Amino acid sequence: MTTFSSFPSIFVPLVGLVFPAIAMASLSLYVQKTKIF
């Protein structure tokens, strides 16, 4: 039970940091590919 209760406290910040990083990386690659800037 202790591992299950401590799982969200590790999983939520991980998703909160990894997901925006992947979104920014894919967005920057898309901008470089289309060469808007």
Curated annotation (Swiss-Prot):
Biological process terms in GO annotation: photosynthesis
Superkingdom of origin organism: Eukaryota
Entry keywords, A to Z: Chloroplast, Membrane, Photosynthesis, Photosystem I, Plastid, Thylakoid, Transmembrane, Transmembrane helix
GO cellular component terms, semicolon-separated = chloroplast thylakoid membrane; photosystem I
The protein's topology relative to the membrane is: Single-pass membrane protein
Membrane-traversing stretches:
10-30
**Where is this protein found?**
Plastid, Chloroplast thylakoid membrane
The protein's predominant localisation is plastid
Alphabetized NCBIfam families for the sequence: PS_I_psaI (TIGR03052)
Q: Which family does it belong to?
A: Belongs to the PsaI family.
- Function comment: May help in the organization of the PsaL subunit.
Q: What is this protein called?
A: Photosystem I reaction center subunit VIII
Q: Which organism is it from?
A: Gossypium hirsutum
